[in-house]
């Protein structure tokens, strides 16, 4: 297991070097964005950050229905970006055009597109059907994942004990209240458990407000709290949750029951993420930010469940180390 992890570290370093070379030698190109009106500004901003493509989107078409000139508009560009809010008919037209015109295309997936990922073909007489993957782990995957959790969490606890001791002293010196903060979260199969964290907020921070997501520049966060949140040190006690079998090293982040109820009302498919154990880190944490929308995080979580493997978990662990030095990833909601 450890030799495999070392090989993955070398592979990660090599991929990073190749990625940086690709960015520096990327040829100039331009693109067109087809999307819904409500997502246009956000997608244009986000796509502009890819590979430093600040001027990648030259034109935005909010709706192709009734627009007879959309193909001639697209002819001028190298890339086509497709938003999530377009209806299926519009997406089909754009994709058919893009393939015939040999355009490079990118699409923001919806739950429907996610469900069609990694499907297998079934022939019913002469009718092709796709078998949609169930969002469940096999018995073998569960065993291997548990073995990885134990083999990582025990050495991590031993190595990080001095850091956790220093954090304990710093929290005690900085503000009144307990060092360890436990909070009810929703875990696998919807069962609740208490997650452990180093306290980063003032004692009884939500006594009057009730459950509230942390905001950027939140006054409830202590001085030490800002540092341990930025470096994710506040999450270290969750290694004991992993040892207890309540969490995994990698998986969807556990959320509070109050917010889970809200999210499920808005998006019933949010419940799918409870088919696996919650994690200390996950694909949503390395690909998104703290203030990434719940829906976008859900897409990442479902991608992870479909792609789960020991290799995937090890890659996410390594990517997490890179994310730790990015302050923007820990900013609160605005």
Task: List the predicted regions and their residue ranges.
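Transmembrane alpha-helices and immediately adjacent membrane-cytoplasm interface residues
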Residues: 1-25
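A hydrophobic, helix-centered structural microdomain
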Residues: 141-204, 241, 310, 316-334
């Amino acid at each position: 297991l450890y030799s495999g992890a070392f090989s993955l570290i070398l592979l990660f370093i090599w991929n990073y070097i190749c990625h940086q070379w690709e960015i520096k030698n990327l040829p100039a190109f331009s693109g067109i964005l087809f999307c819904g009106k409500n997502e246009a500004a956000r997608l244009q901003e986000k796509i502009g950050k890819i590979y430093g493509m600040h001027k990648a989107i030259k034109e935005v078409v909010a709706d192709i229905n009734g627009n007879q000139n959309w193909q001639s508009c697209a002819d001028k560009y190298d890339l086509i970006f497709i938003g999530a809010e377009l209806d299926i008919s519009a997406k089909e037209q754009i994709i058919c055009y893009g393939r015939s015109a040999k355009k490079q295309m990118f699409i923001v997936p919806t739950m429907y597109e996610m469900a069609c990922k990694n499907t297998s073909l079934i022939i019913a007489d002469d009718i092709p059907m796709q078998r949609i993957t169930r969002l469940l782990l096999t018995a073998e995957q569960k065993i291997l994942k548990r073995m990885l959790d134990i083999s990582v969490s025990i050495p991590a606890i031993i190595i990080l004990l001095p850091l956790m001791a220093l954090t304990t002293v710093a929290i005690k010196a900085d503000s009144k209240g307990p060092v360890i903060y436990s909070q009810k979260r929703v875990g696998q199969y919807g069962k609740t458990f208490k997650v452990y964290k180093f306290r980063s907020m003032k004692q009884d921070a939500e006594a009057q407000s009730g459950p509230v997501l942390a905001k950027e520049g939140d006054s409830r966060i202590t001085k030490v709290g800002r540092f341990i949140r930025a470096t994710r040190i506040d999450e270290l006690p969750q290694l004991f949750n992993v040892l207890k079998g309540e969490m995994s090293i990698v998986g969807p982040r556990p959320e509070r029951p109050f917010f889970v109820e809200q999210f499920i009302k808005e998006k019933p498919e949010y419940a799918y993420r409870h088919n696996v154990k919650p994690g200390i880190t996950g694909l949503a944490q390395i690909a998104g930010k703290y203030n990434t929308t719940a829906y976008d995080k859900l897409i990442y979580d479902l991608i992870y469940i479909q792609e789960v493997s020991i290799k995937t978990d090890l890659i996410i662990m390594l990517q997490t180390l890179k994310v730790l030095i990015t302050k923007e990833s820990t900013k609160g909601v605005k």
